[in-house]
């Protein structure tokens, strides 16, 4: 048995290294090399391709994104969370819950620590091209969604548009269909990869929360883990409670964090030009190229952007498909601006808090300690408590969001039944509890493997299906032109 477990661990570590390690190394001036992982080699070209296909949609249609965000939907499209019906803004909140997590805090700190201030610029660029990928996959999820007999409303995501691709189903053709009797192997592999990934993330979330509360309030991990699981269980084991809770806490937590950052910026306005000068000069600086540091600057920013906004991984489309909307493109625009909110706004909040802190105070620190010291500098003892609470909210909302994603994939694999839905929720709660007591690296690696495989299966089908989303985009723009005269 021991040798079998060792073999499984070896396979997981090998796959993690292959998917996220350096597959291609490009020599650079200064003796350094630019290492490119398979994930970067897949996601960056995909983002550039879809940005060109949509004629630079993130820039060209930014006004349209804001418009769909603030417009009041028709009475039929407003959503009824008690019946499982979500409006466009509610699906954006669910997807934002999973995008906005520990990565917006510690991940950004790690990017700047490893690549300097210039990493922030490349994080922004990655978000811009990632918005186009997010638009395509969310629009496809709407085009191929199904009615959900369990929760009410709709369900869908990559498992369903992958299924339709291999069974040659047209958009909307199977709207009334339940779970098909014949499954697509690729779609099933995507769904399974997602469930593996989200279970692994649950364990990491538990560890993050217990560590933060132990540091801030001296609460023992066992106590914080029990409380976290009990609160989560009350929500996730109730029908349609997840979206209702996220509808409340996500705007609050994001608003609080943004407000704190605005306060930091306003109290350090004279230093702001220097921060921007650092970001742009270190992104393109000759010193970085000559010293061999350009690769670190570029890749830390790119990876941070990719990991944070999830564009291309196929996660967010599981929420986008649940929306009741009068046009599929609107959900694509919602998810495109979701990438903007996550990376350009919230990841930048962490970057500014860190870059407006004297370098000498955080020079020898790592990870969460850097951010806690930065917050302590700006807000005193309150800053440490605030970060612990915000991390709890970010992590907890991520857990609720991934369980929302999981339900459509569980249904695809195991059919429409409450037994499989409840079993996966209990499994995720167990992982959450175990993670609060100890972090097992192999489980985190398993999550990395899961999201890597999700991305491969998703992008594999997105390329041939993207013409459907682009056709829908053209039809949407023509309709808008006629309405606007």
Q: How should these model regions be labeled?
A:
Residues 77-113, 140-143, 150-166, 170, ...:
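Alpha-helical membrane segments and immediately flanking helix-loop junctions
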Residues 1-102, 112-119, 461-485:
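N-terminal alpha-helical transmembrane segments of multi-pass membrane transport
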Residues 53-58, 104-108, 197-210, 232-245, ...:
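Transmembrane helix-loop junctions in multi-pass membrane proteins
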Residues 57-86, 107-110, 116-120, 134-180, ...:
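Flexible loop linkers connecting adjacent transmembrane helices
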Residues 137-149, 262-278, 286, 292, ...:
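Extracellular/periplasmic helix-exit of transmembrane alpha-helices
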Residues 32-68, 113-153, 341-347, 448-461:
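Extracellular loop-to-transmembrane helix junctions
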Residues 42, 46, 50-66, 186, ...:
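Membrane-interface loop-to-helix entry segments
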Residues 50-51, 96, 126-154, 163-235, ...:
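Helix-loop-helix module between adjacent transmembrane segments
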């Amino acid at each position: 048995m021991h040798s079998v477990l060792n073999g499984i661990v070896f396979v997981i570590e090998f796959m993690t290294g292959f998917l996220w390690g350096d597959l291609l190394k490009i020599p650079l001036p200064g003796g350094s090399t630019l290492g490119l992982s398979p994930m970067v080699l897949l996601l960056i070209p995909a983002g550039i391709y879809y940005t060109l296909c949509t004629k630079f949609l993130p820039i060209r249609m930014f006004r349209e994104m804001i418009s769909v965000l603030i417009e009041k939907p028709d009475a039929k499209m407003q959503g009824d969370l008690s019946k499982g019906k979500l409006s466009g803004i509610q699906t954006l909140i669910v997807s934002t819950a999973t995008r906005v997590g520990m990565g917006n805090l510690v991940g950004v700190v790690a990017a700047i620590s490893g690549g300097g201030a210039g990493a922030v610029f490349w994080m922004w660029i990655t978000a811009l091209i990632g918005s186009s990928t997010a638009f395509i996959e969310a629009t496809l999820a709407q085009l191929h969604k199904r009615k959900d007999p369990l929760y009410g409303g709709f369900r869908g995501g990559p498992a369903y548009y992958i299924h339709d691709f291999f069974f040659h189903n047209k958009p909307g053709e199977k709207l009334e269909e339940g779970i098909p009797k014949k499954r697509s192997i690729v779609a099933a592999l995507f769904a399974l990869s997602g469930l593996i990934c989200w279970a692994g993330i649950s364990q990491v979330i538990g560890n993050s929360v217990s560590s933060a509360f132990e540091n801030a309030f001296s609460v023992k991990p066992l106590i914080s883990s029990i409380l976290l699981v009990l609160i989560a269980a009350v929500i996730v084991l109730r029908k349609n409670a997840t979206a209702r809770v996220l509808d409340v806490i996500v705007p609050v937590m994001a608003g609080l964090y943004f407000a704190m950052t605005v306060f930091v910026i306003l109290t350090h306005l004279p230093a702001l030009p220097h921060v921007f000068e650092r970001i742009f000069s270190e992104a393109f600086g000759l010193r970085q190229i000559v010293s061999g540091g350009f690769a670190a600057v570029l890749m830390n920013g790119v990876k941070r952007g990719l990991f944070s906004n999830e564009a291309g991984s196929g996660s967010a489309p599981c929420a986008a498909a649940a929306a009741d909307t009068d046009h599929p493109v609107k959900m694509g625009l919602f998810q495109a601006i979701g990438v903007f909110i996550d990376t350009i706004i919230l990841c930048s909040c962490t970057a500014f808090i860190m870059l407006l802190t004297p370098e000498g105070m955080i020079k020898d620190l790592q990870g969460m300690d850097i951010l806690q010291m930065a917050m302590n500098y700006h807000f005193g003892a309150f800053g440490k408590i605030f970060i612990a609470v915000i991390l709890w909210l970010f992590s907890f909302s991520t857990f609720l969001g991934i369980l929302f994603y999981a339900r459509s994939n569980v249904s695809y694999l195991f059919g429409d039944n409450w037994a499989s839905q409840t079993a996966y929720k209990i499994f995720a709660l167990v992982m959450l509890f175990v993670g609060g007591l100890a972090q097992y690296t192999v489980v985190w690696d398993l999550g990395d493997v899961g999201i890597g495989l999700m991305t491969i299966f998703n992008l594999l089908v997105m390329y041939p299906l993207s013409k459907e989303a682009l056709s829908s985009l053209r039809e949407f723009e023509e309709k808008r032109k006629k309405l606007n005269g």
